[in-house]
Amino acid sequence: MSQPFFQFKQFTVWHDKCAMKVGTDGVLLGAWTPVESSARILDIGTGTGLVALMLAQRCSASVIALEIDGKAAQQAAENITRSPWGSRIEVVCQDFRLYSNKNNSLKYDTIVSNPPYFTDSLKCPDSQRNTARHNDNLSYEELLKGVSNLLSPNGTFTVVIPMDASDSFKDIASSQGLYPSRQLLVITKPGAPPKRTLISFTFIKQDCKEEKLLTEVARHRYSDEYIKLTREFYLKM
């Protein structure tokens, strides 16, 4: 049985009540997202609260951690309460579509999301895991429409998605007035094609700076670049 928690340098994330466990995608999102000068941050689909906690560690902003699943929201709240930044992070258990419609007068300097990524694929019997993994409950169109309503004029939206969804996601984003400014192609082993990508969007059209990140040079041997990006979080970096 896997361990029910993951210990980071400054906080612990319990994930035994959450469908999606602590993973590389979330760690990369929390470490790579630009947060300079951010006063207000929104984490869409916070799950365990991992990304919200990482961003709170990196800056002094207030953070809203939004989660549709009740059990995950409860565990995120518990993880956050035990952390050094409990007073700056608020967990809200609500559907993002409802939240964006009700709160469109609120604006966030930074919005992040590690959204469900399976489309039209076979589902498992676990409804909680389906919600976390399948985008039936929140399509990319709905996500980006809500983001465009809530992002401040000079704000940044950063997302982690499958590489094969990158072009279509950018097309949908541009229809909402959001344009890529940075993109990170994540390669898990030498010689392999990127399977994941992180993209930062703004309302400003500009050349997109593209980078590549190799996470492992061999099995269980992290690359120097990955260590540099995540060393403030992992215990053994």
Swiss-Prot record:
CDD domains, A to Z: AdoMet_MTases
Main localization category: cytoplasm
Localization per record: Cytoplasm
EC number of this enzyme: 2.1.1.223
PROSITE patterns according to UniProt: N6_MTASE (PS00092)
Function, in words: Specifically methylates the adenine in position 37 of tRNA(1)(Val) (anticodon cmo5UAC).
Enzyme class, broadest EC rank: transferase
Any one Pfam family match given in the protein's UniProt record, by short name: MTS
Organism annotation: Bacteroides fragilis (strain YCH46)
GO cellular component: cytoplasm
GO molecular function list: nucleic acid binding; tRNA (adenine-N6)-methyltransferase activity
InterPro entries: DNA_methylase_N6_adenine_CS, SAM-dependent_MTases_sf, Small_mtfrase_dom, tRNA_Adenine-N(6)_MTase, tRNA_adenine-N6_MeTrfase
UniProt entry keywords in alphabetical sequence: Cytoplasm, Methyltransferase, S-adenosyl-L-methionine, Transferase, tRNA processing
Keyword Transcription assigned: no
Protein name: tRNA1(Val) (adenine(37)-N6)-methyltransferase
